[in-house]
């Protein structure tokens, strides 16, 4: 039963209908009383006016209830959640920009058969509890689907609660394998931690590295997850992992861990952390005299483009990381996206902007697929399932590569190995989808 808080009290539609009948009965009784008693016409008019005012108020409240419980017939509401304040806000804001750009273009080109896609955007501050609160808020607002969350830990929290509601969910960037494990409703536009760990271990083998060390944030699902898979894959490939060094979230001095790794003389060091930590680690390693190779994962995105407070282009020279998108990629679709993004925001997009763009592309394609069939009504359980089925079956040609699904919410897609050459990023190798 639909309920809404009105003037500080929860009033149900059933209660509104009952109250309306009471007022109508009251007015009819007044008419009878006027005929059977000495009630004057002036008194009757006054009491009738009061009853009419009450009836009008109930009508307004009922109208508010109806408006709040349904979507406009010419729009489709989609939630967008992420960290727009806090320590990881740069990722959330980048994805939000990409989502908004694609939806703007999509609506300008006719939307979903004339219907616009409207976005409900909410900040979860990078916190799992807040992310679940935002999810409940979106549920109350009757969104049809959600693009989110962004980082792995809040994304897992949302995926857990959304599975019971069968809410269609697309994360642009959550890489933790568990994100898609709770139900068939959750999908991602990016690669998994497992995929990245294996890709970089195989890359190390192809580069001829016989020994590697690792340094990672033990408090992060993303960092520790990729490190674990990388180490396991290296062992399978015959690469000796000489030292694994963990650090705590928030640490800024990595000299002890780096010194321990360098004492084992590895051919390369794997550093699967977000770019703030990774940049500091590379910088401190160079200060310690290490001139060797660092390997990274997609959290390295944003390391360059003038962000020299973490690592300089000179310090990053000859390092490698995997990532599905860089602006330097000489691809026509990428070039068009970079131009459109720069025109909209006055700066170049990052990997996370591109993933947000592709996540919105996936969602809008599914919305149109369902609308084209026209056999289910938005807001129903049947509509949610139809949307989930459409996401699973549609294939989109995104700016981070083609995205398709084969039985799970994890995409089959290509990625890039990126290197740093004379202060600039460039594509070193394309890893094709299997």
Language-model regions, residue ranges each:
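N-terminal secretory signal peptides
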Residues: 1-64
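Extracytosolic ligand-binding ectodomains
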Residues: 23, 30, 36-48, 64-434
């Amino acid at each position: 039963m639909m309920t809404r808080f009105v003037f500080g009290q929860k009033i149900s539609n059933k209660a509104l209908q009952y109250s309306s009948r009471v007022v109508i009965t009251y007015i009819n009784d007044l008419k009878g009383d006027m005929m059977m008693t000495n009630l004057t016409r002036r008194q009757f008019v006054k009491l009738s006016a009061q009853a009419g005012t009450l009836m009008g108020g109930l009508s307004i409240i009922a109208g508010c209830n109806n408006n709040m419980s349904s979507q406009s017939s010419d729009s489709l509401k989609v939630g967008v959640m992420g960290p727009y304040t806090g320590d990881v806000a740069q990722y959330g804001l980048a994805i939000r920009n990409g989502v908004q750009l694609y939806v703007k273009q999509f609506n300008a080109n006719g939307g979903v058969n004339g219907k616009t896609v409207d976005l409900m955007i909410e900040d979860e501050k990078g916190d799992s509890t807040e992310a679940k609160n935002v999810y409940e808020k979106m549920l109350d607002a009757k969104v049809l689907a959600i693009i989110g969350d962004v980082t792995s830990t809040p994304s897992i929290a949302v995926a857990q609660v959304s599975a019971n509601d069968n809410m269609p969910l697309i994360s642009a960037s959550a890489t933790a394998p568990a994100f898609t494990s709770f139900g068939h409703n959750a999908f991602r536009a990016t690669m998994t931690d497992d995929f990245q760990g294996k890709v970089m271990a195989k890359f190390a083998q192809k580069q001829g590295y016989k020994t590697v060390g690792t340094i990672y944030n033990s408090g992060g699902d993303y960092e520790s997850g990729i490190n674990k898979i990388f180490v396991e894959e290296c062992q399978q490939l015959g690469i000796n992992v000489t030292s694994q060094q963990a650090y705590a979230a928030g640490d800024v001095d990595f000299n002890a861990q780096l010194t321990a790794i360098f004492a084992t003389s590895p051919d390369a060091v794997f550093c699967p952390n977000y770019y703030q930590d990774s940049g500091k680690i590379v910088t401190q390693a160079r200060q310690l005299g290490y001139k060797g190779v660092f390997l990274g994962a997609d959290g390295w995105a944003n390391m360059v483009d003038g962000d020299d407070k973490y690592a300089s282009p000179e310090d990053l020279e000859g390092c490698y990381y995997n990532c599905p998108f860089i602006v330097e990629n000489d691809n026509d679709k990428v070039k068009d996206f970079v131009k459109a993004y720069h025109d909209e925001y006055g700066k170049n997009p990052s990997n996370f902007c591109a993933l947000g763009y592709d996540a919105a592309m996936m969602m809008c394609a599914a919305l149109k697929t369902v609308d084209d069939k026209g056999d289910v009504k938005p807001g129903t359980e049947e509509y949610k399932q139809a949307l989930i089925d459409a996401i699973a079956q549609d294939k989109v040609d995104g700016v981070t590569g083609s995205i398709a699904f084969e039985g799970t919410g994890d995409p089959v897609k290509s990625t890039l190995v990126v290197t740093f050459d004379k202060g600039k990023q460039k594509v070193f190798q394309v890893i094709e989808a299997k």
